[in-house]
Amino acid sequence: MVVQVLSFALAILCIMNVPIAICLGAASFLALYMDGSVPLPLLVQRMFTGTDSFTLLAIPLFMIAGRLMEWGGISKRLIDLSMNVVGGMYGGLANVSILACMFFAAISGSAPATVVAIGSIMVPAMIKEGYGKSFSVAILAAAGIIGVIIPPSILFVSYGVSIGASIGKLFIAGIIPGVIMGLSLMLFCYIVSRINGWKSSVKPTFRGFLSSLKKSIWGLLMPIIILGGIYGGIFTPTESAAVACIYSLFVGFFVYKELNIKNTYISFYEAGTTSAMVLLIIATATAMGWILTTEQVPLRIAEALSSLAQSRYSLLLFLNIMLLVTGCLMEPNAAIIILGPIFLPLLQQANIDLIHFGVVMVVNMAIGMLTPPLGVNIFVAQSLQKDIPIKSIISAVTPMIIVLLVNLMLFTYIPAISTVLLKYFA
């Protein structure tokens, strides 16, 4: 009865467009209340336990570092660097947008933040250059999801906490997949631009490249410091996030000199409100996960999938389908916190590497950010150019989703793509 009430309440609340954190918390409360055998204060205790983690401190700290870097002027410097690398080819500005998103992903760890930081500059520039409006917005929405793949990634932190995997290893495992996704989108843009005759008016020079590299190098050093510090044994992932905050303050105030007291306060405020929302989602998702575990739902799912999937290849296919559907309907952090522990026995039974599957799971969630009805990146990108209908953006982004699904299959069935770098950083 508990699972039925939980599922029904969650479905109704989601249909009513209630915020996901409230959906998870209210559905969990109602299920326990109707059951009557578990003291309700235990639900609050489980919510507290879900966020009482030193590792989860990395989430607000990485968000603060990303916002400080953005307000400190890193976005326009990364765009300038990208312009001098790929700006001269067919689809120049589209590819500049993608490369800039890849660079910014290594600083922010958030997909929506990446879309806003790069898109607010590049979408108007692309439209002015003659690119289609829907295409311009769609490419930013698609490229923005790289923000949760290339480290530091908030979703990798959530996954690591949910199943006890090494966050440092997850960060390393996300590098090559993130780069491949970016290059795949760039190839797609190049082909589309040649078909439509979207030539670039940008004329990059080597001197311009060196100048833009010099200006942006301080921002590009941040992910190197983070990963180098973790694997050099200097600090933990959470401590690396704190170091990133201090580094961002130093660069913003003393190097770029674009940070001041006012925009520093705004950075902390924006990061604080966003991370509070994420941590509330994690708290309520943890409580729901505990209820599902108590009701032996993970065991039932494991038995059902084990009977359906006769090999690890078919199992991975089933899991991908489940994750893609979930990613379309649920906030990524909540989905990871709930499904991670449910899938864990299956992964261990099939001898699937947890780091490799972490990349697969996060890529699925990232693609879900492009897919209705949730499609958060589509709505964030559309807010940059409000006169474009959502339907036209969805039409423009659909071929890009197909490209990303091909990438997903590669990451799923060729684990070495995710794990090869671990051999050199172990």
Where are these predicted regions, by residue range?
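Alpha-helical transmembrane segments of multi-pass membrane transport proteins
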Residues: M1-A426
